[in-house]
A protein has these predicted regions:
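Short, hinge-like loop/turn segments at secondary-structure boundaries
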Residues: 43-47, 108-110
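Conserved beta-strand termini and adjacent loop/short-helix elements that scaffold enzyme active sites
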Residues: 29-31, 52-54, 132
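Short, well-ordered alpha-helices that flank and scaffold nucleotide-derived cofactor binding pockets
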Residues: 17, 21, 78, 122
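NAD(P)+-binding Rossmann beta1-loop-alpha1 motif at the extreme N-terminus of oxidoreductases
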Residues: 1-44
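A structural micro-motif
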Residues: 1, 24, 49, 88, ...
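Rossmann-like NAD(P)-binding element
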Residues: 46-91, 95-103
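Rossmann-fold NAD(P)-binding glycine/threonine-rich loop
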Residues: 89, 93-132
């Protein structure tokens, strides 16, 4: 199976590593096509590992993992192109936290009657959004 992963940080790489170990093809996506973390990760993981932009990763994946910081989740999906998510499963691993000078706080946009997962589902109505 082919998986696209939005993000190149620790969570994205751990998920990608395991999927590669299980014999799947994985493409890490970032804002830019030449992200150093993604390049190193792909070299380490061999022929089933690749990298590209958010758009390339989301187009590639039959299932997509969203592993960007929560404050960038909608922005990353917008950059990827919502059309690439249609009729697919999005596993959303984002958290709506803001990290600032060693302090963690909840993003005020998601501290009321809505949560980040709900906002992503509204943004992608033809996608099955799975929250951890």
């Amino acid at each position: 199976m082919k998986y696209g992963i939005l993000g190149t940080g620790g969570v994205a790489q751990v998920i990608g590593d395991k999927l590669i170990q299980l014999g799947h093809e994985v493409k890490l996506g970032s804002r830019t096509a030449n992200n150093e973390n993604a390049i190193k990760w792909a070299k380490k993981n061999g022929k089933n590992a690749s990298y590209g932009t958010f758009s390339e990763a989301s187009a590639f994946g039959e299932i997509i993992f969203n592993c960007v910081k929560g404050i960038h989740a909608i922005e990353a999906i917008t950059s990827a192109g919502p059309e690439h998510f249609k009729n697919k499963i999005l596993v959303d691993l984002t958290n709506p936290y803001i990290y600032n000078d060693g302090h963690i706080s909840l993003d005020p946009r998601y501290s009321g009657s809505t949560c980040l997962g709900e906002e992503i589902q509204k943004f992608l109505p033809n996608t099955k959004v799975f929250r951890q």
